């Protein structure tokens, strides 16, 4: 197990979502629970270039803290909120989320499948 990683290192990063404008995001897995990969709790750092990233309702809960950047965030059709460094967002099970990334964005997230 690697004890130390620089988050901006390219090694270990994988592409994640693509924004409506074609901008890209990436993730670096920090920790994955043992067992079935689809049912495992995962911890990762997610980074994204400016753009709109939308996710449909999914059978998982997610909590994240914004490390850098700024985005307009909407969870489960509630009011859009501007989020930035230090903000904590909780996405309930089966709640859609959209992030309109305004400035290069990075979050530390934990995803817990609830299928």
Per-region residue spans from a language model:
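Conserved short histidine dyad/triad with adjacent acidic residue
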Residues: 31, 42-58, 92-93
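Short, conserved beta-strand element in jelly-roll/cupin
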Residues: 48, 57-73
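Short hydrophobic/aromatic-rich beta-strand segments that constitute the beta-sheet cores
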Residues: 55, 73, 107-109
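Short acidic-glycine-tyrosine-enriched beta hairpin
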Residues: 77-93
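A generic structural motif
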Residues: 74-76, 100
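A short, N-terminal "cap"/entry segment at the start of jelly-roll beta-barrel domains
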Residues: 1-40, 44
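A generic "binding-loop/recognition-motif" signal
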Residues: 49, 59-60, 79, 95, ...
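Ligand-binding loop in jelly-roll beta-barrel domains
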Residues: 85, 93-115
């Amino acid at each position: 197990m690697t004890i130390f990683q620089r988050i901006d290192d390219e090694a270990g990063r994988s592409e994640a979502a693509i924004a409506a404008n074609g901008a890209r995001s990436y993730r670096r897995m920090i920790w994955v629970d043992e067992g079935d990969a689809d049912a495992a709790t995962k911890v990762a750092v997610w980074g994204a270039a400016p753009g709109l990233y939308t996710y449909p309702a999914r059978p998982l809960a997610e909590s994240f803290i914004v490390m850098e950047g700024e985005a307009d965030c909407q969870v489960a059709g509630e009011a859009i909120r501007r989020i930035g460094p230090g903000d904590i967002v909780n996405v309930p099970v089966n709640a859609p989320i959209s992030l309109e990334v305004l400035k290069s964005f990075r979050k530390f997230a934990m995803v817990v499948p609830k299928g």
